UniProtKB/Swiss-Prot annotation:
<dbReference type="Pfam" id="PF13932">
    <property type="entry name" value="SAM_GIDA_C"/>
</dbReference>
<dbReference type="GO" id="GO:0050660">
    <property type="term" value="F:flavin adenine dinucleotide binding"/>
</dbReference>
<keyword id="KW-0274">FAD</keyword>
<dbReference type="InterPro" id="IPR047001">
    <property type="entry name" value="MnmG_C_subdom"/>
</dbReference>
<dbReference type="Pfam" id="PF01134">
    <property type="entry name" value="GIDA"/>
</dbReference>
<dbReference type="InterPro" id="IPR004416">
    <property type="entry name" value="MnmG"/>
</dbReference>
<dbReference type="InterPro" id="IPR020595">
    <property type="entry name" value="MnmG-rel_CS"/>
</dbReference>
<dbReference type="InterPro" id="IPR049312">
    <property type="entry name" value="GIDA_C_N"/>
</dbReference>
<protein>
    <recommendedName>
        <fullName>tRNA uridine 5-carboxymethylaminomethyl modification enzyme MnmG</fullName>
    </recommendedName>
</protein>
<dbReference type="InterPro" id="IPR036188">
    <property type="entry name" value="FAD/NAD-bd_sf"/>
</dbReference>
<dbReference type="InterPro" id="IPR026904">
    <property type="entry name" value="MnmG_C"/>
</dbReference>
<keyword id="KW-0520">NAD</keyword>
<keyword id="KW-0963">Cytoplasm</keyword>
<comment type="similarity">
    <text>Belongs to the MnmG family.</text>
</comment>
<dbReference type="Pfam" id="PF21680">
    <property type="entry name" value="GIDA_C_1st"/>
</dbReference>
<dbReference type="InterPro" id="IPR044920">
    <property type="entry name" value="MnmG_C_subdom_sf"/>
</dbReference>
<keyword id="KW-0819">tRNA processing</keyword>
């Protein structure tokens, strides 16, 4: 028996990293929003790794922040260590990574939700999304409360019909001992949504007091802290070290002797796990030539002795896990506080979604995060942000925010999921982005804050700070272009001291910086009138000047890319009427329903020849609009 419990514009189902960003975006855009969590103690919980960012993931966090999301600000307030990764490589792959105090991270995010206007946080399990005539009408809780809503966003994480697996033990359950959500999947299936099943896992947690750090390599945080959020300032604080050790022959021996007890290798686990975050036993079996593997020992917070054993995710039995741990240098006496486990869960085929993250066939139903087949807090957060924005924009009668592959890593991620689908938990990587020199983490605000302001999520204080930074960068670049460096003896002597050839004729300082051995910082002595600019402005000026030629080439590639993206395909276009398209192409195009030729060209099973046919036919179609039954 159900009862009417209230009415909201948007319901967000789940309050993990996707749900938090979705709910905040929706509410901040002025629509009444309710977010449901099965347990309010689990809001923004970090059930796996205790960090935010990393390679490519740091880019996503910067982009979330640039659009007006919360993740970057939240980690800046709660980090216990911060490092910029890949600094020996080019700026395109520099990625910020911060170790989080897991409890403080979750507590602060929950408080932000609780104190946001238009946002209501409730503890309840949603068992049904009420859909009538392919349109969302409401949601029903396990306790019988019915909420009338105009849009709903699925952010269920790994909780749908989740099953914990440890050796030959398996039981229904969610991460960190929380209950699974067993009833919602069936409701979605009954609404025509295709459900699949994925697997992920997490390592053991061990007691800090039982670790011998003297046998490990200490990894300290950076001395100069770079914040995730463009709004954060002066966030330096005392940091806590992480440690690196390695597995060895004994660890390998333990795994091989017990591989028949691994659910991955004895047939107990049939679902697909993440390729780029394999379990430890999977590493041993897939890379038999490797004698050792990195193991990272990471603190989970300031006020806990729990340490995360990074790189040692496992579904082996508890007794084997303990032997495995104690074979690692520094962990000979390790006490396991939490067991590693694998978890299987229901998720959707993301090709059922539009690029707005709304279901193609269900008006008002959106989906974000691990529900869409992705993995990771950052991948979840950025999808939640886009789904929340687009749910609000839809209800306001506005066009959705669609980020292109040339706009953001978020655009790459969503396009990959929606256009290609995924056969395994999808992880963001820099190699997935064709235009990664343009999509750097340092220029996320320059790429996206204007968009965030236009839709109303970026408020005036942030926008004012953004325009000030943008102007400072542009003015400094213009100034450098107007400074002429002459071929005086003292100038050439200075350059030779930097192993750079002397000048034969005058050159602008902007052009001089382009030399491989020089940069904006080392030529300071040639620039007597240089003002003291913020470090982030100086970094941006240096990157733009040094890489201008490469950046220009990528911009030209983007222009070519846009030509295909601008060739729109009408929603009503019938591929079955097109002569010359292969059967596989017709089936794939009909399923994905690409919005333009660019997206069509990225669909697996659609060849360049199919695209050529499609381009010719679309021109004819546009000339003869209205003749839908005509064959082409």
């Amino acid at each position: 028996m159900s009862y009417f419990a209230g009415e909201f514009d948007v319901a967000v189902i789940g309050a993990g990293h996707a749900g938090c960003e979705a709910a905040l975006a929706s509410a901040r855009l002025g629509v009444s929003t309710v977010v449901f969590a099965t347990d309010l103690a689990s809001v923004a919980m970090m059930p796996c790794n205790p960090n935010i960012g990393g390679t490519a993931k740091g880019h996503l966090v910067r982009e979330i922040d640039a659009l007006g999301g919360e993740m970057g600000i939240n980690i800046d307030h709660t980090y216990i260590q911060s490092r910029m990764l890949n600094t020996s490589k080019g700026p395109a792959v520099h990625s910020l990574r911060a170790q989080a105090d897991k409890r403080k991270y979750a507590e602060r995010m929950k408080h932000v939700l609780e104190t946001t206007d238009n946002l209501h946080l409730k503890q309840a399990e949603i068992i049904k999304v009420d859909i009538e005539d392919s349109k969302v009408k409401g949601v029903l809780t396990k306790n019988g409360a019915y909420y009338k809503v105009k849009a709903a966003i699925l952010c269920t994480g790994v909780y749908l019909k989740s099953r914990i697996i440890i050796g030959d033990i398996n039981y229904e359950g969610g991460p960190s001992g929380l209950a699974p959500a067993n009833m919602l999947s069936q409701s979605l299936i009954e609404s025509g949504i295709k459900i699949t099943r994925f697997k992920t896992g997490t390592p053991a947690r061990i007691n800090r007091r039982t670790v011998d750090f003297s046998k490990m390599i200490e990894q300290k945080g950076d001395e100069n802290i770079v914040p995730f959020s463009f709004m954060s300032e002066n966030i330096e604080r005392e940091q806590i070290s992480c440690y690196l050790t390695y597995s060895g022959d004994e660890t390998k021996k333990v795994v091989l002797e017990n591989i028949d007890r691994s659910p991955l290798y004895n047939g107990s686990i049939k679902s697909v796990g993440p390729r780029y975050c394999p379990s430890f036993e999977d590493k041993i079996m897939r890379f038999p030539e490797k004698d050792k593997h990195q193991i990272f020992i990471e603190p989970e917070g300031e006020n806990t002795e729990e340490m995360y054993v990074g790189g040692m995710s496992s579904s082996l039995p508890e007794d084997v896990q303990l032997k495995m741990l104690r074979s690692v240098p520094g962990l000979e006496n390790a006490e396991m506080m939490r067991t590693a486990y694998a978890i299987e869960y229901d998720c959707i085929d993301p090709t059922q979604l539009e690029l707005s993250l709304e279901f193609k066939d269900i008006d008002g139903l959106f989906s974000a995060g691990q529900m869409n087949g992705s993995s990771g807090y950052e991948e979840a957060g950025c999808q939640g942000l886009i789904a929340g924005i687009n749910a609000a924009l839809k209800l306001q009668g506005k066009e959705p925010l669609i980020l292109k592959r040339s706009d953001a890593y978020i655009g790459v991620l969503i396009d990959d999921l929606v256009t290609k689908g995924t056969q395994e938990p999808y992880r963001m990587m820099t190699s997935r982005a064709e235009y990664r020199l343009l999509l750097r983490q340092d220029n996320a605000d320059l790429r996206l804050t204007e968009m965030g302001h236009k839709i109303g999520l970026v408020k005036e204080d942030r926008y004012e700070r953004f325009t000030k930074r943008k102007t400072a960068i542009e003015d400094e670049i213009e100034r450098l272009k107007n400074i002429q460096i002459t071929n005086k003896q003292e100038v050439n002597k200075f350059l030779e001291g930097l192993n750079s050839a002397g000048l034969k004729k005058p050159i602008s300082l902007y052009e001089l910086i382009k030399r491989p051995e020089l940069n904006y910082f080392v030529v300071k002595d040639l620039d007597k009138d240089r003002a003291e600019l913020p470090r982030d402005v100086q970094e941006q000026v240096n990157i733009i000047s040094k890489y201008e030629g490469y950046i220009q080439k990528q911009l030209e590639q983007v222009e070519q890319f846009k030509k295909l993206e601008n060739r729109l395909i009408p929603k009503e276009f019938d591929y079955k009427l097109v002569k010359g398209l292969r059967t596989e192409a017709i089936q794939k195009l009909d399923k994905i329903k690409p919005v333009n030729i660019g997206q069509a060209s990225r669909i697996s099973g659609v060849s360049p020849a199919d695209i050529s046919v499609l381009l010719i036919v679309l021109e004819q179609y546009n000339r003869n609009k209205g003749h839908k039954e005509e064959e082409f």
